[in-house]
Amino acid sequence: MILANDELKRLISTGRLKVDPLYPDTVRENGLDLRIGGEYAIYAYESTVVRPCDLETAKPLFRIVKSDEVVIPPRNFVLLTTEEYVKMPDDVVGFANLRSTLARYGLVIPPTIVDAGFEGNITIEVVNESPNTIVLKRGMRFLHLVLAKAEGRAQYSGLYQGQRGVTPPKGLKGEC
């Protein structure tokens, strides 16, 4: 069951759902609009062979950029972080979607789940499928997080729990 704005406001007012900072336009009809944070990550090198199964961390592959603008070259991608630090209830799951207006410029994100019990800034992959460089601004609403009630409760203990700022991928060494 997708949660409407009255239920989202109730979860926030009781402290079960935390969004910090919380803006007047964050809670929407059927989800939360989240803003671009002050840093992003882009690949530091081009034409490099990347073997996730051999990596303990992918952090050296990325360059962290602190800026009020996010520059996404044509047919390239960046990792964005939300300005907001989010703490999900243990019985609510989030489905991250790019705001439709940005998709109409040629930006896309992969299907992304924010697990029940997750806490942290949300790092999201944004791909520019257009032939043009797209420049986004810090603080603009870019991500729409639809929240749904889960049956039962989950205890999240993933690798990205508590992350702050943009977080490059972890390596998959030991999983392959």
From Swiss-Prot:
EC numbers listed for it are 3.5.4.13
CDD domains reported for this sequence: trimeric_dUTPase (cd07557)
Where are the active-site residues found? Answer: E125
Reaction catalysed by this chain? Answer: dCTP + H2O + H(+) = dUTP + NH4(+)
SUPFAM superfamilies the record matches = dUTPase-like (SSF51283)
Q: What class of enzyme is it?
A: hydrolase
The residues that hold dCTP are R99, S100, T101, L102, A103, R104, D115, Q163
> Which keywords does UniProt give here?
Hydrolase, Nucleotide metabolism, Nucleotide-binding
Q: Name one Pfam family in it.
A: DCD
Query: Which pathway does the database say it acts in?
Result: Pyrimidine metabolism; dUMP biosynthesis; dUMP from dCTP (dUTP route): step 1/2
The highest taxon in the source lineage is Archaea
InterPro entries per record? dCTP_deaminase (IPR011962), dUTPase-like_sf (IPR036157), dUTPase_trimeric (IPR033704)
Q: Which GO terms describe its molecular function?
A: dCTP deaminase activity; nucleotide binding
Q: What does this protein do?
A: Catalyzes the deamination of dCTP to dUTP.
PANTHER family attached here? DCTP DEAMINASE
On subunit structure and binding partners, the annotation says: Homotrimer.
Q: Which family does it belong to?
A: Belongs to the dCTP deaminase family.
What is the protein name stated in its UniProt record?
A: dCTP deaminase
Which source organism?
Answer: Pyrobaculum arsenaticum (strain DSM 13514 / JCM 11321 / PZ6)
Quick one: which gene encodes this? Answer: dcd
